[in-house]
């Protein structure tokens, strides 16, 4: 009972438990049964509200509600999906997104028509690779192209990344590639934010000559990563810096923090305003607006939406004079994300981001009483370096089990690379990106983007140097699902409780390590036609083909 005030932190955990059960099932539970069960358990929780069993009843109600909600969201997302390859066939549709400005480009088409499919069997969205786009084509334009369409790929191996599941919840029912050059059928509609994204990307591409630096700048500013050269992308991954390219909480937090500080400092220059009005709240409201605009500019993907929820809740706490940014805020953000997008629970981005944030907040709550003394004792610069080191270590350790589960690889020198790259991104690259974007309407973006390019060059040099070190990348069999679940349970127990019994969470982490250590890679895998084999005998994987995927293991 000593930690009764922490019980509420477990509410999203039980809701997530129900969602996790849904996605672990190999059959679709009838929606009317899960809805009835959710209603009955909710009534039971209400009945037990004055009983000592109320916490257990509420936990059960939330778990069943999560099971129902995941199924309900699946029904809402259900749409036609291509079941077999077809083509050549004429495909037309309106461009929803494109991943780059020029050259070979991947586009997502909505409102699609396929000449060889009836309307009721035509996917609502298609993802195509085409050699180029015709002049004047962009988001909102309608194009037509001769293409070959394929079903969305299944996991490459059992338990691996499932592109078909992700595509299902994004409304994408087929992939394919163009067999010729697309034709423009209708000019682009006025889709302001998409045209703005690509306009900013084009201006950056003209201002920064180096392709690698330009690709990173475009990715950080607009979320478009198609212009980043493959070699640079690989070096960034191998150095453990890939998170810098994926616009998430780090980036939105930096933008919101910089805007908040700038607006508050500017308003403080007028004593008559600063003394009479709540300028801090005005700055927080402006920062929320800036973060929302940045989310739209980055494509409003699920990770950026999740990050915006976190940032907005933190700034709303400032506006209502609740300055403590604690674990309740993290729990509320997780609840909001799971309600909006239950599928997010299964994604690497959700697991990595919330693992890092929860661990950082838990460590902050533990160290909060001594932070002021440490800052005065060390001085500003040493304290900042120590805080950066601690933040990097905590985030790396917290995300390691989930990175092992999803990727089966670690960047051995990622800690050192992040200690150099993250401060450069926070205090050099992102401020220059904001200034450059704001200066574009005046045509004055060249100088801020030159400063941004210099910072990106430093990060790229760090990535290339670190990734070239011997043993920079360590590969191993992915952690089994059971290990990831044990790590999540242990980590949550450590982070959500505050008394000594939180240390029982170490048992969950130890179990995760034991499960991972005992996992044995398959000796033999075969595709659905039994034409592709892989044998693990000397630690290597031997493939007869490289295009198919594995469906079973021996």
Report residues per predicted region.
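Hydrophobic alpha-helical segments
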Residues: 1-25, 316-318, 435-453, 457-460
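Alpha-helical transmembrane segments of polytopic membrane proteins
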Residues: 31-39, 352-353, 418-423
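N-terminal leader/targeting segments
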Residues: 1-81, 192, 306, 481-482, ...
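Non-globular, low-confidence helical/coil segments that flank catalytic cores
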Residues: 94, 119, 132-146, 166, ...
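Hydrophobic alpha-helical transmembrane segments of multipass membrane transporters and ion channels
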Residues: 9, 13, 209, 213, ...
